[in-house]
Amino acid sequence: MPPSAAKQMGASTGVHAGVTDSSAFTRKDVADRPDLTIVGDSVYDAKAFRSEHPGGAHFVSLFGGRDATEAFMEYHRRAWPKSRMSRFHVGSLASTEEPVAADEGYLQLCARIAKMVPSVSSGFAPASYWVKAGLILGSAIALEAYMLYAGKRLLPSIVLGWLFALIGLNIQHDANHGALSKSASVNLALGLCQDWIGGSMILWLQEHVVMHHLHTNDVDKDPDQKAHGALRLKPTDAWSPMHWLQHLYLLPGETMYAFKLLFLDISELVMWRWEGEPISKLAGYLFMPSLLLKLTFWARFVALPLYLAPSVHTAVCIAATVMTGSFYLAFFFFISHNFEGVASVGPDGSITSMTRGASFLKRQAETSSNVGGPLLATLNGGLNYQIEHHLFPRVHHGFYPRLAPLVKAELEARGIEYKHYPTIWSNLASTLRHMYALGRRPRSKAE
């Protein structure tokens, strides 16, 4: 169990005790102080600021002890308001450290797309969205309740798994990116739908917001690029003879994401980390609620049905729901970041196709791909427009089809590749060819 933020930081009510405005911090200094965060070349009091953050305290808390430069830029689509944040300023990044700079090209693109987002919504969910969300959530709750009363059936259990996936794609995803509503409370409440369908909001935020979005396809930092030997996803992965067949067992293997939801989440929660990356101690106040919600899911979705109808059939139906939802989610996320020509990101001197020094705009666009059009976007929460989503995660998915032509033109004008597959099949075929190529034994330097 993680120590509470209060215990970790002592009884002091702020970081200013013993700290002057001229203090210089190394990145290690900040990493050891979860009450601090870095933006650009400055260090700020994250603990003091989080309660005033309009988007919710949990977002700021997750970046305690971290560099939030690109996170702020990506979620607010503007330059850091240094003068407004001066009262939270506690020092500067040491001269020995290289600050992360805002991507001016990205901010220029943000200014262009701002003109295409209706001012009445400011990029949050339009009124029509709430009808869709209500239908999906209501259908899932009604179907689950019906099967508790009438008993589990295999086909309805599969349908329920699909509805769980739609909740993940259409509701919790936008909510946990802060894209549904200007109200942090609304986003937080609907973000907890991740716990309702068997996941964990706090683990999702750590995996997706803190790690994946800022380090997409980074060979060391993106948790979605770690398959622990089961798959060879990137050129830096060690090769095994089993990888000859990875393009064949990839799709069946995606159903195994279910076991992550059922088992791995609990151990990661207890260890307060994701894929070895610690969750900020500043977010420690979310530990107990997150653990209780995980146990509540087990009680509601696993223990209660088995208590009411103890049988192998009931267990199979429970597994069918979780595996169906897991497969649907994993399938679309996987094909959007693993395809022919996709960039892999690594440090200078690595064998990756892109270095971490590339612009934010280029790193996000060339590690993602789009598929299909507005119809699939309506069904899948706009995540078939993965490029637009990675560039503008706090813009509601309903706007992505409208933004896509401008984004494509802007990126191509800057010499940045924009990959859009017309069909799911064409995207899948590219993914399988990509996995086949990575599954071949790499040549040694002597060959």
UniProtKB/Swiss-Prot annotation:
A motif (Histidine box-2) lies at residues 208-213. It comes from the Eukaryota. Its EC number is 1.14.19.31. It is found in: Membrane. Gene3D superfamilies: Cytochrome b5-like heme/steroid binding domain. It catalyses: a (7Z,10Z,13Z,16Z,19Z)-docosapentaenoyl-containing glycerolipid + 2 Fe(II)-[cytochrome b5] + O2 + 2 H(+) = a (4Z,7Z,10Z,13Z,16Z,19Z)-docosahexaenoyl-containing glycerolipid + 2 Fe(III)-[cytochrome b5] + 2 H2O; a (7Z,10Z,13Z,16Z)-docosatetraenoyl-containing glycerolipid + 2 Fe(II)-[cytochrome b5] + O2 + 2 H(+) = a (4Z,7Z,10Z,13Z,16Z)-docosapentaenoyl-containing glycerolipid + 2 Fe(III)-[cytochrome b5] + 2 H2O. A motif (Histidine box-3) lies at residues 386-390. Residues 36-94 form the Cytochrome b5 heme-binding domain. Fatty acid desaturase that introduces a cis double bond at the 4-position in 22-carbon polyunsaturated fatty acids that contain a Delta(7) double bond, resulting in the production of delta-4 desaturated fatty acid docosahexanoic acid (DHA). The cytochrome b5 heme-binding domain acts as the direct electron donor to the active site of the desaturase, and does not require an external cytochrome. This is Acyl-lipid (7-3)-desaturase. It comes from Rebecca salina.
